[in-house]
């Protein structure tokens, strides 16, 4: 619930995806923000800067923020996330009126963007990352946690795992991976319809070599993905998730089919990079266990 905006029976991870379809609010501003998110790239191929300026123009036009309806404020926040303007997203959330800032949805997105900015900082901003975890812990303590809360919490530790793994600190990496698994498990148990913590839970089990447990869980996650695809038009991440699950189960012919379905739905090249990163992890960990990695290598090459 966000000040009169209800997501009854919705999967928590889908709140930001379905928000614009489910919530009635100022149609003119809604269209202005839709245009802002899709401003064409400039002559140098840079679309992001122009889109940020366009969103900021909408904010300037209707501020102060206290006079803007709650749903529009949420759309602005999601718009910054949609275009990956994470610094601007964080700055905007901090300016939100208190009654909006303290809602569960905004607090979850606040934790998400704190972790994203903290992890991308050079050097890593541990203070920001710790604040992200504190936000999620407060939601849990207050009984407001959702599968999305735990999914974001798992992502904090998965990012810590990635940093430790890339720096060659395998001991720390394994410890962080186990913590990520714990929160992804909590998220999927909280709501088995939410495939996001589910697929990450399965992937963590795969990386830790707990294959049998991963295979027992996998059909439930696959069902959750397909159920989501029946609720709304499939997107890139739906097929990418099915691809990853098929790889874990060694169904490589199906994995290739899912890849072919996913490719036309990728609206940004970084989407392929995310999938390649996940597949590379599975491949590297299997290689360390002396397992066959050739089929995974072929899929990675197909991603370009």
Language model feature labels by segment:
Residues 117-124, 160-167, 206-218, 248-252, ...:
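Alpha-helical linker/edge segments of TPR/alpha-solenoid repeat scaffolds
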């Amino acid at each position: 619930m966000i000040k009169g905006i209800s997501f009854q029976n919705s999967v928590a991870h889908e709140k930001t995806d379905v928000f614009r379809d489910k919530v009635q609010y100022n149609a003119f501003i809604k269209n202005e923000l839709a245009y802002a998110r899709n401003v064409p790239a400039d002559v140098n191929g840079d679309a992001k800067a122009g889109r940020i300026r366009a969103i900021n123009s909408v904010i300037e036009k209707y501020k102060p923020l206290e006079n803007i309806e709650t749903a529009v404020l949420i759309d602005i926040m999601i718009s910054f996330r949609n275009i990956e303007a994470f610094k601007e997203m964080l700055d905007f959330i901090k300016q939100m009126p208190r009654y909006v800032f303290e809602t569960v949805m905004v607090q979850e997105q606040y934790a998400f963007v704190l972790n994203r900015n903290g992890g991308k900082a050079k050097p890593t901003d541990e203070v920001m990352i710790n604040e992200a975890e504190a936000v999620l812990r407060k939601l849990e303590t207050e009984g407001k946690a959702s599968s999305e809360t735990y999914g974001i919490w798992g992502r904090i530790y998965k990012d810590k795992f990635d940093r430790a793994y890339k720096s060659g600190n395998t001991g720390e990496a394994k410890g962080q991976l186990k913590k990520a698994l714990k929160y992804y498990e909590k998220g999927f148990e909280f709501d088995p319809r939410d495939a996001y913590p589910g697929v990450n839970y399965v992937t963590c089990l795969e990386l830790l070599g707990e294959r049998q447990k991963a295979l027992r869980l996998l059909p439930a996650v696959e069902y959750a993905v397909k159920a989501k695809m029946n609720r709304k038009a499939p997107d890139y991440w739906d097929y990418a998730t099915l691809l990853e699950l098929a790889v874990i189960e060694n169904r490589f012919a199906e994995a290739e089919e899912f890849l072919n379905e996913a490719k036309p739905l990728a609206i940004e090249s970084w989407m392929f990079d995310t999938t390649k990163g996940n597949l590379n992890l599975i491949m590297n960990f299997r290689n360390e266990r002396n397992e066959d990695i050739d089929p995974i290598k072929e899929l990675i090459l197909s991603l370009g």
